[in-house]
Amino acid sequence: MGRTLKIFAVLAAILAVLLGASVVFGTGIFARNSPSASARACPPSSPVTVGRIVVPAGPIAGYCQDRLINAAHVMMAARSLGIGPHTQAIGVMTALGESGLRVLDHGDAAGADSRGLFQQRDNGAWGTYADRMDPYISSLNFFTKLVSIPGWKNLSPGEAAHAVQVNEDPNHYDPYLPRAEAIVTALGS
């Protein structure tokens, strides 16, 4: 009994140290698609223009310019289809939930062939590899699919994202909406 308690105490101490480091450094267990630790102090950079959107160094909603540029591509793709800020936020929310606004060149649990901002699969529905890796084209493909869904305007943002992405968890995208709205508002003004 005494030995079991010692082992339990050692394991609990190790877990506490790991969780503490995760909280202090903003990495690890709880940071899969959260803003990077470096986003709290973005590197100085000149504004970049994506279409008509001027992207500052950041941070906006905890994200720096490298990821905000991708959000601007999502917004520009939506605008090219006549889609307003509310639905632009759905696209940004989805990209946050899928990749943390990064163009990922590797798969995820849903599929080893998933790529890009939206982790789109190589099943022919999302275009070529190059299309899936291009923030603007992959965003166009996302919004084209969204507007083809009957009644999409009546769906909540999370339901709309889920209808396109068919994530295992239909509520997966909901926590990303406030940051997406903040990004769209800041970049849209």
Q: Which residues are covered by each model-predicted region?
A:
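A general structural signal for well-ordered secondary-structure junctions
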Residues: 30, 84, 100-101, 152, ...
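Export/targeting segments at the very N-terminus of extracytoplasmic proteins
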Residues: 41-96, 100, 187
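Soluble periplasmic/extracytoplasmic beta-strand elements of cell-envelope proteins
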Residues: 91-93, 117-121, 163-165
